[in-house]
Amino acid sequence: MITREFDTIAAISTPLGEGAIGIVRLSGTDSFAIAQKIFKGKNLSEVESHTLNYGHIVDPQNQEILDEVMLGAMRSPKTFTREDIIEINTHGGIAVTNEILQLAIREGARMAEPGEFTKRAFLNGRVDLTQAEAVMDIIRAKTDKAMNNAVKQLDGSLSNLINNTRQEILNTLAQVEVNIDYPEYDDVEEMTTQLMREKTAEFEALLSNLLNTARRGKILREGISTAIIGRPNVGKSSLLNNLLREDKAIVTDIEGTTRDVIEEYVNIKGLPLKLIDTAGIRETDDLVEQIGVERSKKALQEADLVLLVLNASEPLTDQDRQLLEISKDSNRIVLLNKTDLEEKIELDLLPTDVIKISVLHNQNIDKIEERINQLFFENAGIVEQDATYLSNARHISLIEKALESLQAVNQGLEMGMPVDLLQVDMTRTWEILGEITGDAAPDELITQLFSQFCLGK
């Protein structure tokens, strides 16, 4: 009997809705046979692999033509899933793609589960878990640099690093075993306490360096969480609209117009900035506005960057001073808005690196972008050529656990424990790293990971 893992699956691989092209994908042993039942054109058993073939999709029960298509035929093992794959390129639209999918299912295919095509690629050894996760990162990437990082991971940058480290750990464990089982072998280097200490330090340094990339990787994947704060009606929402170059926030002269937190993404020199337009922080009796103010304070605490907007045409208020105080320890840029009006703000009470802007006239908005680039990218050295960045919370957690196991090895060495008794913690490190690539990942984890994928991927 064909198992559920290896029967023939089908799904629509393009977003539902109107479009130029829609793709219905099949993968499995019977892909060609099922497609032949509904495809009127060349004999698919005779076509060369990796070719596009013109024809029509026809309902075999009544010979009704559903659409004119180009059918992609790809034979295993040189496919994404390492199974036979058929991709029916049809005209985009909800009705036609659904009709073709239902035909394929009626003729023997099964509706694919979310992420099942990529899961099969993993189970068949085409990709490991880090590469499978990179597929989703590519789909979700908001900027070119985020996409490039995901592409490098798909190409095996993280896999190679983890696999090489696991191999070195395995070599160390094997050396300990040989010393125990065959002490008479003089040609095998003895794994002394000092040598084990050196090996452990080497592994720790490598994994620590990788872990240190997590902050930059998180920025690439999720964006810089940027809270725009200020008292009501200083121009926060107008600034958001200027940075986005479109109107997303309501702009009026009425205080308290923004009553909740508005989140939008903008591309700053190839990196994602998650802009959070907060409700003006002030004392208010309006219950709805109070909730917005509390959310603003929370956004301020969690932000990677704070843009504090002040009104340059008015003296500092108590609210301004409060905001300057509560944001002083943040990664902050102070912006003086309304500089097109007469300047009345006390400059001597402000940081020296304030940026003067006018959101009404779109003046110096580019200087904000330049400052952000300096703070996060140029000074921090983010996105070095060919660097590998940890951007996945699962990977980060497992690297931290692997380092804990190595620290346990070090503690044992400091206590004078024999090298052979430290194998357990060293082996645990090897196993944890295997969870990253999927070599030692439990089935429940694999199922959960792929369930997060979209249908048809």
Curated annotation (Swiss-Prot):
Cofactor(s) the protein requires to work: K(+)
Query: Could you tell me where this protein is found in the cell?
Result: Cytoplasm
TrmE-type G domain residues are 223-377
Q: Which InterPro entries match?
A: G_TrmE, GTP-bd, GTP-bd_TrmE_N, GTPase_MnmE, MnmE_dom2, MnmE_helical, P-loop_NTPase, Small_GTP-bd
Enzyme nomenclature, EC number: 3.6.-.-
Record GO terms (molecular function): GTP binding; GTPase activity; metal ion binding
What biological processes does GO assign it? tRNA methylation; tRNA wobble uridine modification
What positions does the entry give for (6S)-5-formyl-5,6,7,8-tetrahydrofolate binding?
A: R25, E87, R126, K457
How is its cofactor bound, per UniProt?
Answer: Binds 1 potassium ion per subunit.
Positions annotated to bind GTP:
233-238, 252-258, 277-280
Q: Which positions does UniProt annotate for K(+) binding?
A: N233, T252, I254, T257
State the UniProt keywords alphabetically. Cytoplasm, GTP-binding, Hydrolase, Magnesium, Metal-binding, Nucleotide-binding, Potassium, tRNA processing
Instruction: Note whether Nucleotide-binding occurs among the keywords.
Output: yes
One Pfam family this chain carries?
Answer: TrmE_N
Q: Where does Mg(2+) bind?
A: S237, T258
Record's GO cellular component terms: cytosol
SUPFAM superfamilies named in the record: P-loop containing nucleoside triphosphate hydrolases, TrmE connector domain
* Domain of life where this protein originates: Bacteria
Tagged with keyword Metal-binding: yes
Subunit-level organization:
Homodimer. Heterotetramer of two MnmE and two MnmG subunits.
Q: Which family does it belong to?
A: Belongs to the TRAFAC class TrmE-Era-EngA-EngB-Septin-like GTPase superfamily. TrmE GTPase family.
Concerning NCBIfam families, the annotation shows: mnmE_trmE_thdF, PRK05291.1-3, small_GTP
Q: What does this protein do?
A: Exhibits a very high intrinsic GTPase hydrolysis rate. Involved in the addition of a carboxymethylaminomethyl (cmnm) group at the wobble position (U34) of certain tRNAs, forming tRNA-cmnm(5)s(2)U34.
Q: What is this protein called?
A: tRNA modification GTPase MnmE
Q: Which gene encodes it?
A: mnmE
